[in-house]
């Protein structure tokens, strides 16, 4: 049986990390694509030269032509401009929308059967535009946001409670922006919901609120520290988890930006919700009950994404 083919559009910090992780996990052969000549070729060769040490078999190809992604099983899109200090994810809109148009055309021509994972910010608007530009079915095009946001939430909670990250489950809904909705009620430590842990005296509501805010600011915190770029290790790990669930038909329950068709009262928009990811892409969207406050926060997040999509239509009327 031939190996799977994983195409990475964009060979920056996230692209390079994705390529390395895909090799370490032996998910398949990797094509690194970038418009900058030499970068994908150099990174591909460097990672390939690490394979004898780490003991994995994968072929690495660097390319500057979309033809190289032909027949890819998974395409992960990181192309675009990253955030710089003081920039919001939304400031990137105009620049990265043009990139999505080119990427969408490349995927449509060479990898129409692929499962596509978008990482480019502003995430929810970019994955929405990418699906329209590529013409791929919506269940095969998703955005990576919720896995990362939930991972940040889980890490902060594990630090607060001094327990293993593996025993913390966390839930983040909504857009991948400052209005994301980390849900304490559906987040647990060894099955015990966070509100119960507050009652048990493990933490205070005030501390929990601060952790929720830190989760919202997670990306900006790293941008502020790095000064010349944005996060790449955790975003890459998150996208690889999604790709692995698809390639191995694991049917993991993962929060991703998926196209809603009426769930949560939302239509024709990509928003972060819990899904089941298997060999058919998004196989199920899980609609959980939200209380009044959670629903209000979720609706606010959706409104923020809707505003970005409207702005996209203003720039590229063909998206309407």
From Swiss-Prot:
It catalyses: (S)-malate + NAD(+) = oxaloacetate + NADH + H(+). It is an enzyme of class 1 (oxidoreductase). Its EC number is 1.1.1.37. Transmembrane segments: none annotated. GO terms for biological process: lactate metabolic process; tricarboxylic acid cycle. Keywords: NAD, Oxidoreductase, Tricarboxylic acid cycle. The lineage of its organism: Bacteria, Pseudomonadati, Pseudomonadota, Alphaproteobacteria, Hyphomicrobiales. Catalyzes the reversible oxidation of malate to oxaloacetate. NAD(+) binds at residues 10-15, 34, 96, 119-121. GO terms for molecular function: L-lactate dehydrogenase activity; L-malate dehydrogenase (NAD+) activity. It comes from Brucella anthropi (strain ATCC 49188 / DSM 6882 / CCUG 24695 / JCM 21032 / LMG 3331 / NBRC 15819 / NCTC 12168 / Alc 37). This is Malate dehydrogenase. Substrate binds at residues 83, 89, 121, 152.
């Amino acid at each position: 049986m031939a190996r799977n083919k994983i195409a990475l559009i964009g060979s920056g910090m996230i692209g390079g990390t994705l390529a390395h992780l895909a090799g370490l996990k032996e998910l398949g052969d990797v094509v690194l694509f970038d418009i900058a000549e030499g970068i994908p070729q150099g990174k591909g060769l460097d990672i390939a030269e690490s394979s004898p040490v780490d003991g994995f078999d994968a072929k690495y190809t660097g390319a500057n032509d979309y033809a190289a992604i032909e027949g890819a099983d998974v395409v992960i899109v990181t192309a675009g401009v990253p955030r710089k200090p003081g920039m919001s994810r939304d400031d990137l809109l105009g620049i990265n929308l043009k990139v999505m148009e080119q990427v969408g055309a490349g995927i449509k021509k060479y990898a129409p059967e692929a499962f596509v994972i978008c990482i480019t910010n502003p995430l929810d608007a970019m994955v929405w535009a990418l699906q329209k530009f590529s013409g791929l079915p919506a269940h095969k095009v998703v955005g990576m946001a919720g896995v990362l946001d939930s991972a940040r939430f889980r890490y902060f909670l594990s630090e607060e409670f001094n327990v293993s990250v593996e025993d913390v489950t966390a839930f983040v809904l909504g857009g991948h922006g400052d209005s994301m909705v980390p849900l304490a009620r559906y987040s647990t430590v060894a099955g015990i919901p966070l509100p119960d842990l507050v009652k048990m005296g493990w933490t205070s509501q005030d501390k929990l609120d601060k952790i929720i805010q830190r989760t919202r600011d997670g990306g900006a915190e790293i941008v502020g520290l790095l000064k010349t770029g944005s996060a790449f290790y955790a975003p890459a790990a998150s996208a690889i988890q999604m790709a692995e669930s698809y390639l191995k038909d694991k049917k993991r329950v993962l929060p991703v930006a998926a196209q809603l068709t009426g769930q949560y009262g939302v239509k024709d928009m990509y928003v972060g919700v819990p899904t089941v990811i298997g060999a058919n892409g998004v196989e199920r969207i899980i609609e959980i009950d939200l209380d009044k406050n959670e629903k209000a926060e979720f609706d606010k997040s959706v409104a923020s994404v809707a505003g970005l999509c409207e702005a996209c239509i203003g720039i590229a009327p063909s998206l309407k």
